[in-house]
Swiss-Prot record:
Cellular localisation: Cytoplasm
Catalysed reactions listed for this entry: a (3R)-hydroxyacyl-[ACP] = a (2E)-enoyl-[ACP] + H2O
Active-site residues, as the UniProt record annotates them: H54
Name of this protein: 3-hydroxyacyl-[acyl-carrier-protein] dehydratase FabZ
One of the protein's GO biological processes: fatty acid biosynthetic process
Organism: Enterobacter sp. (strain 638)
Lineage: Bacteria, Pseudomonadati, Pseudomonadota, Gammaproteobacteria, Enterobacterales
Family of this protein: Belongs to the thioester dehydratase family. FabZ subfamily.
Length: 151
């Protein structure tokens, strides 16, 4: 457990998110402010299983997984802001608008994801997400997420 309340290491992330290898896409939280924003990192390794087929000889991190990594970051922000999931609750990726991919992400890149809380309405929370590598935007999107009891 860290002593700095604005960073989270993998052990703390595993306590918050239900995701596990190979689908856990957040390695560390660099900074956050409850109810406002969170900045996290995904270290992109050539050992990721999807690189075998995406694409042979020219590995590119799938854009849909960039979006998933940002969605996982919203989950961490939500759980740090309003509490962890209770038994029987799920946190859903409910929608996406204005997704744009600006440049490819490749093995060896360190992808920084910043998600910002925008608003909650009718059980949906809207976040703005931006992913970057070396200070250059690789993806941006508006994401909607919902927290609810299992059906």
């Amino acid at each position: 457990m860290t002593t700095d309340t604005h960073t989270l290491h993998i052990e703390e992330i595993l306590e918050l998110l239900p995701h596990r290898y190979p689908f856990l896409l957040v390695d560390r939280v660099l900074d956050f402010e409850e109810g406002r924003f969170l900045r996290a990192v995904k270290n992109v390794s050539v050992n990721e299983p999807f690189f075998q087929g995406h694409f042979p000889g020219k590995p590119i991190f799938p854009g849909v997984l960039i979006l998933e990594a940002m969605a996982q970051a919203t989950g961490i922000l939500a759980f740090k802001s309003v509490g962890k999931l209770e038994p029987g609750e799920l946190y859903y990726f409910a929608g996406i608008d204005e997704a744009r991919f600006k440049r490819p992400v490749v093995p060896g890149d360190q992808m920084i994801m910043e998600v910002t809380f925008e608003k909650t309405r009718r059980g949906l929370t809207r976040f703005k997400g931006v992913a970057s590598v070396d200070g250059k935007v690789v993806c941006e999107a508006t994401m909607m997420c919902a927290r609810s009891r299992e059906a």
